[in-house]
Regions:
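Sequence/structural signature of beta-propeller domains
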Residues: 1-308, 312
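Sequence-pattern detector for short linear motifs
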Residues: 93, 314, 324, 353-356
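Intrinsically disordered, low-complexity regions enriched in serine, threonine, proline
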Residues: 308, 318, 347-350
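Intrinsically disordered, low-complexity Ser/Thr/Pro-rich tracts
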Residues: 306-316, 355-358
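C-terminal membrane-anchoring or membrane-association module
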Residues: 335-358
Length: 358
């Protein structure tokens, strides 16, 4: 996996299997083999801040056009704008940047996610600081209209995600971590907040839980987490994307629909499973020198709905193609075997003819 200076978040994957990565105020694309290339266009923003991002996923056909008379375009990137006026920037697949929405009455923006469940109207969800110990949650539709869900949610920051239907009483809520308390919270579309679990991991500024992510349906790939270089910190980071495979986590008891949560300091990891009750299982408890930031992003999920018809693309091979490699090798091996058999038969026939002439 290529190094990306100042890597602070990762999003996607896009329809082509590529990840979108933010580093030092610039966007990058990372292909399924780990090679990084600059994102099209000239996007640039604050180089030392934490401009988290979200990539528009595949949406149900029924909601492609909203009541606002527009639609979110799959693969578009929405990035926190952390300078005045605070808000969101939109970057399309061609790299065109536009100011999408301003979010007033907050002093900072701390997290972003896309509502994949629909309880929030399939909108972009953003958290911001609304006062001492309080967060605002705002929902932004495809027209850039900002609606405040609540201004009294707990302090939260980092990689957020909406819970799937299988996540017990918290299904459809916005799941958000708080590094200071070490707690993981669920924020509902009605503005109410509840604690999902205490992480049991080290807590504090630049230490506690930073990211959450749900193990997707039919997962057979990897989960990625940005490891940012942070000089002078006990967890100095490497500017790489950290990765764990589905096989390695399945061997530790992680299942489809579970919530994973990772810390900022050391990238320790827990598994949270909620049905009628929630249980917390430590997965990685020994802190490393990693300095985690942003989202936990999974590749290699099996779509629940049929994917859109593939379109011609100038991009290199997608993750789906890399997954076909064993089939390619099998066909090659069978073909080689048949060639050997045919050659052997020809040699035998030649010898028999020679004996007949003798």
């Amino acid at each position: 996996m290529a190094k990306i200076a100042g890597v602070v978040d990762v999003g996607g994957p896009r329809a082509d299997g590529w990840l979108v990565v933010m580093g030092t105020g610039k966007l990058w694309l990372v292909d399924p083999l780990g090679a990084a290339t600059p994102y099209p266009g000239t996007y640039g923003d604050a180089t030392t801040a934490e401009p988290y991002l979200t990539v528009v996923p595949q949406l149900p056909h029924a909601v492609l056009t909203s009541s606002a008379g527009c639609s979110f375009q799959r693969g578009d990137v929405y990035v926190l704008r952390l300078h005045a006026p605070l808000g969101l920037n939109r970057v399309d697949a061609q790299g065109q940047k536009s100011a999408f929405a301003n979010i007033p009455n907050v002093t900072n923006l701390t997290g972003i996610a896309f509502d994949t469940g629909g309880a929030f109207g399939y909108r972009v969800l953003v958290t911001g600081t609304a006062g001492a110990g309080k967060s605002e949650v705002a929902a932004i539709d495809c027209a850039g209209t900002v609606s405040v869900i609540t201004r009294s949610a707990p302090t939260v920051e980092g990689g957020l995600e909406v819970a799937p239907p299988s996540f017990g009483a918290f299904a459809g809520t916005l799941i958000a971590p708080d590094e200071l308390s070490g707690n993981i919270y669920a924020i509902g579309a009605d503005g109410t907040s509840r604690a999902v679990a205490a992480s049991g991991l080290p807590k504090g500024s630049d230490i506690g839980v930073e990211a959450v992510g749900f193990v997707p349906h039919g997962w057979h790939g990897s989960v990625y987490y940005a490891d940012r270089v942070t000089k002078g910190n006990p967890h100095p980071g490497t500017d790489n994307l950290l990765a764990l495979t589905s096989d390695s986590l399945a061997g530790l008891g992680v299942q489809e629909g579970d919530l994973l949560s990772a810390t900022e300091g050391g990238a320790t990891l827990i598994d949270v499973r909620c049905t009628t009750t929630c249980t917390v299982q430590p997965i990685i408890t020994s802190a490393t020198k990693a300095h985690g930031e942003g989202h936990l992003i999974f590749t290699g999920a099996t779509p629940i709905e049929p994917s859109p018809s593939p379109r011609a693309s100038a991009q290199p091979a997608t993750s789906g193609r890399t997954g076909d490699a064993p089939t390619v090798f099998l066909v090659a091996a069978v073909t080689a075997g048949l060639v050997v058999i045919v050659l052997a038969v020809l040699l035998v026939l030649r010898d028999l003819r020679a004996q007949g002439r003798g």
